[in-house]
Amino acid sequence: MKIDTDREAAYKALLAIERERLYSNLELSKLLNGDEILNKGFIREIVYGVIENKIYIDYILDKFIKKGVHKTKLQSLIILRMGVYQILFMNSVPNYAAVNESVALARRFAKGMDGFINGVLRNFIRNIDSASEVDVKGQLEYLGIRYSCRIELVEELVNMLGFEHTKLLLKHAGKRWPLSIRVNTAKISVEGLAERLRAKGFDTQDSKLSDRVLIVKGGALTETNEYKEGLFSIQSEESCAIADFADAKSAELVIDLCAAPGGKTAAMAEQMLKASNMKESRTVTESSTESGKIIALEIYEHRSALIEATSRRLGLDNIEVKCHDATKQIDELVGKADLVLADVPCSGLGVIRRKPEIKYRDEFDFDELVEIQKNILETGSSYVKYGGELVYSTCTVNPMENEGIIEDFLSRHDEFISEKEIKLSPFVNGYDGFYMNKLKKIEGRVPNGCGVQDR
């Protein structure tokens, strides 16, 4: 029996992710980069679907495997998980195809187990309604099994958010996110790019969250000339909303403290270039107008290279990349920046559907994260000039990492006030969980709780 190449690719990705504890998004990007033969959407659906529902699928399989899931060899278990996911969640795949293709995979990658896999999957199909039910007494245990999340994290989330919000968050984590792109409005209008993409067969819709984001369906966007020309970038609506919120248009110097992989850096740089271009078009002089500059800090060299590559593709010459630890102060930048973005490392609890491995993490050291976040914000605040702004953002719904950080910072910094706060979350407005707060450094105030004084 010939093996379906898409399912083979999905199997190999799942095996590598499980064995080596890799991030699914990175492994899939590596696997699917530039290969036109593969059905990328189908592979992503199976890989993400299996990872998102792993505990639930294993709970089902335990009903049909006498020795239990935990004693089943990994190769067989991954094939069974793929089969159950296709049968239970993928209406486009007939049950017989899910079984037959799983058997074909077993003959190649789990030799001698094809009969066992065939029997388990057929037995599941015969008993699908009863087997799919989660029959446990505790509410938290139910959430952990049905939405495939370690019980310890479920307990943490319920303590943070309450039961109903935790349930909504975990349900949201099982939904597919729309593919969105940020238009490089320094080069082309949103309408202009939408027209070009529609002419190539793509379906485009305007984002409700950002006026320079399009929701796109219809094919391999990164292989279009428009992508290669730097007319757009793949970026979530929520991430672009942070750059919109920061609003770097009029800034002369912006410092992005945790810049890699560079999406928000580039989004701000595009804002600045577009504003500069508009200013030049209104100026009668022949001399060009400076667009301002972004200093992008990143602690790791290989991730700094990602920012530089993004800048080159988009044609952005107003970004300077520095390999630097954001918790350490750069003396020559103190008091120089119009805008500082502190998009800090966080628990990622707001983006579980994009990083489903978060649900299975052994533990979260929230105290350590909070200390890092405080240190980055503290260091970043020193770069802000009087009258300048400091934007703090995360992709988590944990109040300790969000409002808690801001409250702590403001209690020690009378020279800053909170101008604006935005919360995105599945249980408030249906988006992934992001937090943003814009702080302004007020002229005539001094730090360390000294109150308002003349300077």
Regions found by a protein language model. Give the residues of each.
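S-adenosylmethionine
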Residues: 1-455
